[in-house]
Amino acid sequence: MKRLILPFLSVGLLLGTTAHAATPLKTEQDKLSYSMGVMTGKAFRKHDIKIDPQTFSMGLSDAYLGKETQMTEAEMRQTLQQFEKQSLQKMQHKMKQTAQQNAEKSRAFLTANKNKPGVKTLANGLQYKVLQAGQGQSPTLNDEVTVNYEGRLINGTVFDSSYKRGQPATFPLKSVIKGWQEALTRMKPGAIWEIYVPPQLAYGEQGAPGVIGPNEALIFKVNLISVKKK
């Protein structure tokens, strides 16, 4: 319950406005109160929380001024618990729908992509295209690699890029997603590949909240710069 409710209430605790005609914001307290009200309202809208603004203001005012509330603590707790339960069910349903939609889009993309010139497909579904060949010994899962890369969603949105940061990334090969492991252990230093990673070899049904949705196929341009043997 705290995850869904308290962030909004903590922002709005000083809000004392109701749905009246606009009044001038003369003092800093006026501006602060209004700003917190706007922030709280935006949070409710963002999370699709349906409230009655006047009743919300009444409850806020009663609590802030120390007045007797119109509901007991037990009644309010039960109401908020029921709200959280419904919100969680709604969120899970939406996630399931999104996962199904993304899975269909990913399958369609990979099915079309595998027939494009230069694209090769491995037995596990990973697809890749060699943009530049490399030389030397390929890394093993026990090695550390240094790479430059750009990650994109299938709609073209760039979600991560070492090129933009201006600095290559170095990491143990064991620490990255399966799709990267499969590709990099086949690459040689200096190679540049574009890899097309199905959801099960990327972030799966969980996704990476805020960045990558559930069941999203990903596209990476990867330049293997060097390998450090372990």
From Swiss-Prot:
Membrane-spanning segments: none
Pfam family, one: FKBP_C
GO biological process, alphabetically ordered: protein folding
Top-level taxonomy: Bacteria, Pseudomonadati, Pseudomonadota, Gammaproteobacteria, Legionellales
Family: Belongs to the FKBP-type PPIase family.
Record protein name field: Peptidyl-prolyl cis-trans isomerase Mip
Signal sequence, start to end: 1-21
Organism, scientific name: Coxiella burnetii (strain RSA 493 / Nine Mile phase I)
Subcellular location: Secreted
Domain annotation PPIase FKBP-type: ranges: 142-230
Catalyzed reaction equations: [protein]-peptidylproline (omega=180) = [protein]-peptidylproline (omega=0)
GO molecular function terms noted in the UniProt entry: peptidyl-prolyl cis-trans isomerase activity
Disulphide bonds in the chain: none
GO CC, one annotated term: membrane
Role: May be an essential virulence factor associated with macrophage infectivity. Exhibits PPIase activity.
EC nos: 5.2.1.8
PANTHER family associated with the record: FKBP-TYPE PEPTIDYL-PROLYL CIS-TRANS ISOMERASE FKPA (PTHR43811), FKBP-TYPE PEPTIDYL-PROLYL CIS-TRANS ISOMERASE FKPA-RELATED (PTHR43811:SF57)
Keywords: Isomerase, Rotamase, Secreted, Signal, Virulence
InterPro entries, alphabetized: INFPOTNTIATR (IPR008104), PPIase_dom_sf (IPR046357), PPIase_FKBP_dom (IPR001179), PPIase_FKBP_N (IPR000774), PPIase_FKBP_N_sf (IPR036944)
EC top class, as a word: isomerase
